[in-house]
């Protein structure tokens, strides 16, 4: 499967990622490479392999719980289709 530039633009729009036309072909190549890897995975013979629900015995490494301000408010809000001050603006869904 190969993605054309129009599909890459649509994926970027749905993901709310702003891309320049100059970056479009590079992104198209990266996405096509990822899809190529997925196609390779589909060719792997998995007959007789039990499905894995989870790792079961894996544990997450504990870290100290530290409160931060995030320091990325402006970067996050730059992806919002509409904002009012430091908040996302969304359409009213409940009357």
Swiss-Prot record:
Q: Which organism is it from?
A: Gluconacetobacter diazotrophicus (strain ATCC 49037 / DSM 5601 / CCUG 37298 / CIP 103539 / LMG 7603 / PAl5)
Summarize the subunit comment.
Answer: Heterotrimer of A, B and C subunits.
Q: Which InterPro entries match?
A: Asp/Glu-ADT_sf_sub_c (IPR036113), GatC (IPR003837)
Gene Ontology terms for molecular function: asparaginyl-tRNA synthase (glutamine-hydrolyzing) activity; ATP binding; glutaminyl-tRNA synthase (glutamine-hydrolyzing) activity
Q: Which family does it belong to?
A: Belongs to the GatC family.
Q: Which domain of life is it from?
A: Bacteria
- Main role? Allows the formation of correctly charged Asn-tRNA(Asn) or Gln-tRNA(Gln) through the transamidation of misacylated Asp-tRNA(Asn) or Glu-tRNA(Gln) in organisms which lack either or both of asparaginyl-tRNA or glutaminyl-tRNA synthetases. The reaction takes place in the presence of glutamine and ATP through an activated phospho-Asp-tRNA(Asn) or phospho-Glu-tRNA(Gln).
Could you tell me which Pfam families the record lists for this protein?
Answer: GatC (PF02686)
Keyword terms, alphabetized: ATP-binding, Ligase, Nucleotide-binding, Protein biosynthesis
Which Enzyme Commission number(s) are on file for it? 6.3.5.-
Q: Looking at the keywords, is ATP-binding present?
A: yes
Q: Which Gene3D superfamilies match?
A: Glu-tRNAGln amidotransferase C subunit, N-terminal domain
Which Gene Ontology terms describe the biological processes this protein takes part in?
glutaminyl-tRNAGln biosynthesis via transamidation; regulation of translational fidelity; translation
Give the catalysed reaction(s), semicolon-separated.
Answer: L-glutamyl-tRNA(Gln) + L-glutamine + ATP + H2O = L-glutaminyl-tRNA(Gln) + L-glutamate + ADP + phosphate + H(+); L-aspartyl-tRNA(Asn) + L-glutamine + ATP + H2O = L-asparaginyl-tRNA(Asn) + L-glutamate + ADP + phosphate + 2 H(+)
The protein's name in its UniProt record: Aspartyl/glutamyl-tRNA(Asn/Gln) amidotransferase subunit C
